[in-house]
Amino acid sequence: MLVLRGAPALSEFRTKKLMQSIEALNLPVHALFAEFVHFAQVSAQLEANDQQVLDKLLTYGPKIQEKQHKGLLLLVIPRAGTISPWSSKATDIAHNCGLNNVERLERGCAFYIDADPLNDTQLIQLKNVLHDRMTQSVVSDLQDASILFKHEAPKPLTSIDVLGGGREELVSANVRLGLALAEDEVDYLVSSFEKLGRNPNDIELYMFAQANSEHCRHKIFNADWTIDGQTQPKSLFKMIKNTYEKCPDYVHSAYADNAAVMEGSFAGRFFPQADNNQYRYHHEDIDILMKVETHNHPTAIAPFSGAATGSGGEIRDEGATGRGSKPKAGLVGFSVSNLRIPGFEQPWENDYGKPERIVTAFDIMLNGPLGGAAFNNEFGRPNILGYFRTYEQKVTSFNGEEVRGYHKPIMLAGGLGNIRKQHTQKGEITVGAKLIALGGPAMNIGLGGGAASSMASGESNEDLDFASVQRDNPEMERRCQEVIDKCWQLGENNPIQFIHDVGAGGLSNAFPELVNDGGRGAVFSLRNVPNDEPGMTPLEVWCNESQERYVMSVAPENLATFTDICARERAPFAVVGEATQARHLTLDDSHFNNKPIDMPLDVLLGKAPKMHRDVQSKALTGNAFDVSNIDLDEAALRLLHLPAVAEKTFLITIGDRSVTGLVNRDQMVGPWQIPVADVAVTAAAFDTYQGEAMSLGERTPAALLNYGASARLAVGEALTNIAAADIGDLKRIKLSANWMAAAGHPGEDAGLYEAVKAVGEELCPALGLTIPVGKDSMSMKTQWQDAQGDKAVTSPMSLVITAFGAVKDVRKTLTPELTTKGDTCLMLIDLGAGQNRMGASCLAQVYQQLGDKTPDVDSPELLKGFFLAIQQLVNEKALHAYHDRSDGGLFTTLVEMAFAGNTGLDIKLDALTGDNASALFNEELGAVIQFDADKLNQVDAILAANGLSGVSHVIGTLSDDDQIRFSREGEPVLQNSRGVYRNAWAQTTHHMQRLRDNPECAEQELASKNDLNNPGLHAALSFDVTEDVAAPYIAKGIAPKMAILREQGVNSHVEMAAAFDRAGFASVDVHMSDILAGRVSLSEFQGLVACGGFSYGDVLGAGEGWAKSILFNAMARDEFSAFFERNETFSLGVCNGCQMLSNLKSLIPGAEHWPHFVTNQSERFEARVAMLEVKDSPSIFFKGMQGSKMPIAVSHGEGRAEFAQTTGLEAALDSNTIALQYVDNYGKVTEQYPANPNGSPAGISGLTSKDGRATIMMPHPERVFRTVANSWHPDDWQEDSPWMRMFRNARVYLG
């Protein structure tokens, strides 16, 4: 084993934050220093040249001053017996660089601790701060890392002596293994194995427990019900299915697959042809798939990993729909208990304590969103929708006084995708079909996730809780998705017959489900399962929940095609079994020469006992909420600090929202990028204005007073949100319903039944809405003991609705951005019809009240009329702005619109009934619309035709100053400056950013928000955006070949290909594996573009691993060097491609002054809209664009330009090779955050070679080449945005 020192692992402010965590434990630690250490397992001593390559390979990242090692060494390494995702990717790079004697690379982090002597307890506490016990170990000597390369012998299975010891043996195993089997399931298993005449193996019991857990089987939703002695006619699931029976319109797949499918658009899907890899449009039906999952239990234990794998699992559900499909855009949501942000605690936030095994709500929101965002970012899916609610309060509800809240959080992960009509249904699994596991290896993690998720928090052993959390590797999932994409792109020749994702229960659930759903049995070989921990037992190999895996069946005659696709994408797979005619499951173990599983599928899946719920309903005992003594000024500021109302930028800018180039509406609105959008919208393709929309609705605290109302409000809010998009027919909208409840808690079961009936039997059929997909989580309760005795925090019954719909014209989507042009009116449409019910409102929450009566959907017809009226107004382009009324009421709706429009307001409450507090802060459904004053009659007529005249009120207009005024009958009711409200609204985000990211950047961003003169994003162009300079060359009919270059983990190649295709190029998909295998030569191409993403997951530095696999591979180096030397060629590197090409500068003529790119100053992934200025440089891409200033999408974690020498910046400026610079909204070159999102010196965002043929840039022009793909744009831009000019300039350059 070789030991190689690396760079310092922590920046100054990260070290400071770690020290603060250690000081909070009162440990006598004075200082620490952290450094990466690399370990190489080699098969033979490396020659000098190889050693030099290895040294260079492991030198990466930013320059940080090295320090002397002193103090106690604590070396954090991956858990012994595992192979980390870092290791597998770094080893791949080493092999691609020709280091064949390097068998494996691994990385640790050496902490040198300056401390007084530590006792054993203190040492354990310190180690717990420094490492993640799920995936890491701590040793005290560098040579101890050699355990990383030792392999244990496989461990045998164990059997449970049911035949000899009877039922008690199984009861004991149930507790020991954390199986969560019900009493009747224990009886069923005892009976089944007595009939088989043998004892069950542990693996068989575990497999049964996972497959039949509440998490997987949804036993409560399929149960028979008796409520208050009355037998109920339907199960919960049947009431949900009732919506489909009443309205099956536009639904192509429901309840039968990993996701539901609905009718979408007809447009041109853009992907490469199989025969020559050239991209082209394929005009066909582009149907919409939809799925929303929850990952609550793991997120309470390990927030980053729980949320990351929650998103990853949901993405796999989408990709595994039908015979393979394409995830497109994501959403995420969180409900947690009170944040109690250190230094920003709020008056309503009492601390009721928590058990040790779960983390705090603050920790969940500090790390969980990062996990969800990181997975989506690296996979390459834009995350463009979300919600965030906190609730934790002692209330008097149905069960008397108790604490209700989200100690067990809701972590929502969902999204939409697209699927070919021909692949919507699963195919036939033929007898003899190869049963394949695609994706990463088995590791001993995530055991028992399904069963653990099915228990109330506190019922299981703490070690089992930790064992049930999975770990993520999104770059692997991206490779798998590329394989699935290549399969469905073959159309009728798609080799995938049947596909499922691997989730809860691992292969033990996925493979039996696959063959059972396909009507087959199977014979499997345990030792064919790819395995990174050979020492695992058969149970651990078969049942672990290692992520990024799919199972599928492929006919033997198509296996060669599938194998070739996987090889090109470097996606590992294995044939694990074969499908059989007999519905029997056999698992052979060649190592121990036995059969760990040998049972009929019917025993596993067919006849488990059906649940019966016999429950009682509870009467309400709430008290009215008295608002008469509330100070309105204080109430307004409290509400603006409540997370459900407050600004959520800290949850949004961490997530890529522009990847794919198909995002039309993300959360950020207008020139000031205010996060207030009601709906997320994507375009169906690059050649259409049709698209897809999704929105969220949830009013969970209302369930503490009225279960049915809470459910109806969730549906209503999803509709008032999606109404901002151009949908048309209400039947075009389909819903996902995610149900969370504390089953067994007094009154909650009957309440759940009431809520499901309210939407499934009543509201949705009345509206013509269908719920074709959903999920339930029935153990939303946390129990523990402390010095004060038994404690519990029980979640409200929680329904989260996601609405999905096909969009007719994405350009018509409305936002809350008020226009300040002309004479306009603001109108409130009040679907509560003046009732102003205040129960369970945000105002009640911030005063620690609950109230008695909640808002409700009293008239489905009124809600339907509202939706149709707004749709007509959208279609006729009669409105300037739209914002629904929700958390915080009318006050919040209006101030958010004022923030988006950067304007003051004059609001008159005269037309609104009731007291001022209720008028301002009630959360009845409704919306505020803005329109030209001279269109009042047109608007009135449309509202009247839909039955809304009596609930629609003109309430005011914009003010000429910065004040937001509310008055009644000429008397002031509430008034403050927009600046005061804007600052208050920003505080939650600001404090979370300060504690999570670089505090200096957080301070700079707050200062930017408080700059009331900030002119916002704008465009000042030096050229005519409507001119197509490439048209004369395209007319010649010659399309120069353009290499759209990608490496494993790259995710922005399709939109790049589309941009060059539009400019007249023949865009060709080129994988690095094509070049390394000699299948493709760069001599065929006149242009090359290295695309954005996360090559090799950014191990060994962003883009550096990719570059070094070229520099240190003789064949690849020669290919690229020859290409760059040819005078008639050009090259472009964007984002990850920019990072990569900057590390190839030794091969690129005239690029010697280029920097490389390192971690952003914020030390956070930054997804922003930034202003760029095009400089006067030789770049062929920016000819005629010099002096232009315009917005562009930015999405990267390592974009800060760093020069090797201190004189590097000056040399770059002197050589005129800086092509692009970040400017602020005043148009000045800036290093200030967030206008400069990464802290690059002199605002550097792009550079060129001295002859202009090679250009690199961190921002993403390919994602915004269409005007509709820009988060904000001037009204006069047409189809093409100004960034399209640079691609056309490249075509002009070739002549």
UniProtKB/Swiss-Prot annotation:
Residues 1042-1295 form the Glutamine amidotransferase type-1 domain. It is found in: Cytoplasm. One of its GO terms (molecular function) is ATP binding. Its main location: cytoplasm. One of its GO terms (biological process) is 'de novo' IMP biosynthetic process. It is an enzyme of class 6 (ligase). It comes from the Bacteria. It catalyses: N(2)-formyl-N(1)-(5-phospho-beta-D-ribosyl)glycinamide + L-glutamine + ATP + H2O = 2-formamido-N(1)-(5-O-phospho-beta-D-ribosyl)acetamidine + L-glutamate + ADP + phosphate + H(+). Pfam families: AIRS_C (PF02769), FGAR-AT_linker (PF18072), FGAR-AT_N (PF18076), FGAR-AT_PurM_N-like (PF22689), GATase_5 (PF13507). SMART domains: GATase_5. One of its GO terms (cellular component) is cytoplasm. Mg(2+) binds at D678, E717, N721, D884. PROSITE patterns: GATASE_TYPE_1. Keywords: ATP-binding, Cytoplasm, Glutamine amidotransferase, Ligase, Magnesium, Metal-binding, Nucleotide-binding, Purine biosynthesis. Its EC number is 6.3.5.3. Pathway: Purine metabolism; IMP biosynthesis via de novo pathway; 5-amino-1-(5-phospho-D-ribosyl)imidazole from N(2)-formyl-N(1)-(5-phospho-D-ribosyl)glycinamide: step 1/2. Residues 302-327 are annotated as: Disordered. The active site is at C1135, H1260, E1262. In the N-terminal section; belongs to the FGAMS family. PANTHER family: PHOSPHORIBOSYLFORMYLGLYCINAMIDINE SYNTHASE. NCBIfam families: FGAM_synt, PRK05297.1. Monomer. This is Phosphoribosylformylglycinamidine synthase. The gene is purL.
